[in-house]
Amino acid sequence: AWKGMKSITITEVEYVAYRLAKEHMLWDEPIPDFSSRFPNALESCLATPFQAFGGKKLYKGLIEKAAILFYLMVKNHPFKNGNKRIAMVTLFYFLSKNKKWMEVDNQELYNFAKWVASSNPKLREDTVSAIKNFLKVYIKDL
């Protein structure tokens, strides 16, 4: 297995993903100021994919990590608005940092993000599994 997987920092979300979402995905609603985000929610979203328990990684491989990252960015609402859009750009950024990309239409990905957002939290594992399958369909090497 490839050992050099790169995580994302809060600063990268602020300066890359958040800014890109704000510039290119305003659509109907504005995205509020980065400083208005909820304390610790974003930190948790970014840390969870890399957590271990009893010496074992909870999420193995890039697809699993990307899937839980996207799920948490959408479902945990780290921002007051724009969570789905910021989640999309964060996903692209995480993949590109790890030499991957998704060849998917923005609207299709946004529709999928809306589906994830409306999913039943009790079905978290099934939803994350669906995200993994979605990623497998569209992921490409950079």
Can you describe what each PLM-predicted range is?
Residues A1-L142:
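FIC/Doc superfamily catalytic core
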